[in-house]
């Protein structure tokens, strides 16, 4: 599995996930509309969202755009 791994809105950096990591995720703070920064990467399970945070998970190459 290959997931995007950079904080910019238009990310092109791919990271090859380790064995056992079968989820790509993207998380961001829903309050910050301008200058939005993302945390993207691989995970074993979908991360739990903190208050006012949005977490999106998927399981195909490059799906965490």
UniProtKB/Swiss-Prot annotation:
Keywords attached to this entry: Disulfide bond, Secreted, Toxin
Residue ranges the record marks as coiled coil: none
Cysteines engaged in disulfide bonds, as pairs: 3-24, 6-11, 17-42, 46-57, 58-63
Organism for this UniProt entry: Naja nivea (Cape cobra)
Protein name: Weak toxin CM-10
Gene Ontology molecular function terms on file: toxin activity
PROSITE patterns for the chain: SNAKE_TOXIN
UniProt KW Disulfide bond keyword: yes
């Amino acid at each position: 599995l290959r997931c995007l791994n950079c904080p910019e809105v238009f990310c092109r950096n791919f990271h090859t996930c380790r064995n056992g990591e079968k989820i790509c995720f993207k998380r961001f703070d829903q309050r910050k509309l301008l200058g939005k920064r993302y945390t993207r990467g691989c995970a074993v399970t979908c991360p739990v969202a903190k208050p006012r945070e949005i977490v999106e998970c998927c399981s195909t190459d490059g799906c965490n755009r």
